[in-house]
């Protein structure tokens, strides 16, 4: 069970270098399990016991498993996660020709750790919009092979490199993708033309625009002397997306279950497909009668907001409160912040702790040091947007926002088990 779940996560990470690809991967799994796609532009005809999913912007997804009881009686059991991760995104006019090399200008998306991006075998993926035969179309592309690198400057030329050398994103992060012959010009859009033909058999009249991100081609892996860890890119937060999907597809019971995987969390969630937009509320309203049905159903509902937590790093243990240091493989972490950076309260935390105990899953607590600031999640955003009671949780992780993060290999099974128990729970607090 644990090995199978971990391998499934590794496969999901490999297939999901961008939020667009992650959403497509989730949709494929749902369709294989009998879920039917709903188009927001059409009238919906849903029924008790139905299985559905909705996407928006190709980068956010809501999966719906309706029970036999009306949400007005039993509410919704919601699990929330996000599909995006910090990365380097290609600029609109990216070509940089310097000293015989072709580089691409990049914009930093989210709060990325810069240093780990150096000396990696990078590829490129995302969404391309183009015109073909006079028709406007979009397709996902993934170069898959390593096409770029950001080489470090040798220590001989930068003696202060190990003394906290600041990295300038504008000047030092553009990846090298090719050498140029003297006088040779480069057009990045021609490369995208070739990729569309190679990957989709489409000859584009013109590439109009794109949303493309570099990513590390090194596959995720189970590592450690005793296989204790999972190392890989985008664990924050595709790990939670994968856990939520596994729990949804395998949960027992007959409740109204929702999985929400939204884009743009790393940049504030303020978009038409992000948690700070209307996506979730609009979908839920379409599952309910008009009038006060939404307010009544949402007050019977609960959201588990799942986003990775900071595990105690042995080299930096003093960065944690001494009594609230989550351990890798120690189970899910309940995140608490009195200033509402997390939406957890005593009632929702107590309920989640109860689920863990009933499921024989270890559970931990996280509170940031009182002299340090605290990050946030989609939990408070969704709670304030929709009015749903929320508990913020996540699996402990090292190197969050690095190009390669680290989590415990036992924890995915822990999270899937307790989320399955949540989806199956007949009573909410």
From Swiss-Prot:
Offer an example of a GO molecular function term for this protein: zinc ion binding
GO cellular component annotations, sorted alphabetically? cytoplasm
For the keyword Protease, the answer is yes
Record-annotated residues binding Zn(2+)? 82, 156, 401
Required co-factors: Zn(2+)
Q: Which InterPro entries match?
A: M18_aminopeptidase_2, Peptidase_M18, Peptidase_M18_dom2
User: Please, which domain of life does this record's source organism belong to?
Assistant: Bacteria
Q: What is its EC number?
A: 3.4.11.-
Q: EC top class, in one word?
A: hydrolase
**Do you know which CDD domains this protein is assigned to?**
M18
Q: Which Gene3D superfamilies match?
A: Aminopeptidase i, Domain 2 (2.30.250.10), Zn peptidases (3.40.630.10)
Alphabetized, the UniProt keywords read: Aminopeptidase, Hydrolase, Metal-binding, Metalloprotease, Protease, Zinc
Q: Does the keyword Metal-binding apply?
A: yes
Q: Name one GO biological process term.
A: proteolysis
> Which family does this protein fall into?
Belongs to the peptidase M18 family.
Protein name, as recorded:
Probable M18 family aminopeptidase 2
Its source organism is Pseudomonas paraeruginosa (strain DSM 24068 / PA7)
Q: What is the lineage of its organism?
A: Bacteria, Pseudomonadati, Pseudomonadota, Gammaproteobacteria, Pseudomonadales
- The gene name reads apeB
């Amino acid at each position: 069970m644990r090995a199978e779940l971990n391998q499934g996560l590794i496969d999901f990470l490999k297939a999901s270098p961008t939020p667009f690809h992650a959403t497509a991967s989730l949709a494929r799994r749902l369709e294989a399990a009998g879920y039917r796609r709903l188009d927001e532009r059409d009238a919906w005809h849903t029924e008790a016991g139905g299985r559905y999913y909705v996407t928006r912007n190709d980068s956010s997804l809501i999966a719906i498993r309706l029970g036999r009881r009306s949400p007005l009686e039993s509410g919704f059991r919601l699990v929330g996660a996000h599909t995006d991760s910090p990365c380097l995104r290609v600029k609109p006019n990216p070509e940089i020709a310097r000293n015989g090399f072709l580089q691409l200008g990049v914009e930093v998306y989210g709060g990325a750790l810069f240093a780990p991006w150096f000396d990696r075998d990078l590829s490129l993926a995302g969404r391309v919009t183009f015109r073909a035969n006079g028709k406007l179309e979009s397709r996902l592309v993934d170069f898959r092979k390593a096409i770029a690198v950001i080489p470090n400057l040798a220590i001989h030329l930068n003696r202060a490199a190990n003394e906290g050398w600041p990295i300038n994103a504008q000047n030092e992060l553009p990846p090298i993708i090719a050498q140029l012959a003297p006088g040779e010009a480069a057009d990045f859009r021609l490369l995208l033309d070739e990729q569309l033909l190679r990957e989709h058999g489409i000859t584009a009249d013109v590439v109009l625009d794109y949303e493309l991100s570099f990513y590390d081609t090194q596959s995720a892996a189970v590592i450690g002397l005793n296989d204790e860890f999972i190392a890989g890119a985008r664990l924050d937060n595709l790990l939670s997306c994968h856990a939520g999907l596994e729990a949804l597809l395998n949960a027992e019971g007959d409740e109204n279950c929702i999985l929400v995987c939204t884009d743009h969390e790393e940049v504030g969630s303020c978009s038409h497909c992000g948690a700070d937009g209307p996506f979730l509320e609009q979908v839920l309203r379409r599952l309910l009668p008009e009038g006060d049905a939404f307010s009544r159903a949402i007050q019977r509902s609960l959201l588990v907001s799942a986003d990775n937590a900071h595990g105690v790093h042995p080299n930096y243990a003093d960065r944690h409160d001494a009594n609230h240091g989550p351990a890798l493989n120690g189970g899910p972490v309940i995140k608490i912040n009195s200033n509402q950076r997390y939406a957890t309260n005593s009632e929702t935390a107590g309920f989640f702790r109860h689920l863990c105990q009933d499921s024989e899953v270890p559970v931990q607590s996280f509170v940031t040091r009182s002299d340090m600031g605290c990050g946030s999640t989609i939990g408070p955003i969704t709670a304030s947007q929709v009015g749903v009671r929320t508990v913020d949780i996540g699996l402990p992780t090292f190197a969050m926002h690095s190009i390669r993060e680290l989590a415990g290999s036992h924890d995915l099974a822990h999270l899937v088990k307790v989320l399955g128990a949540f989806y199956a729970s007949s009573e909410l607090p």
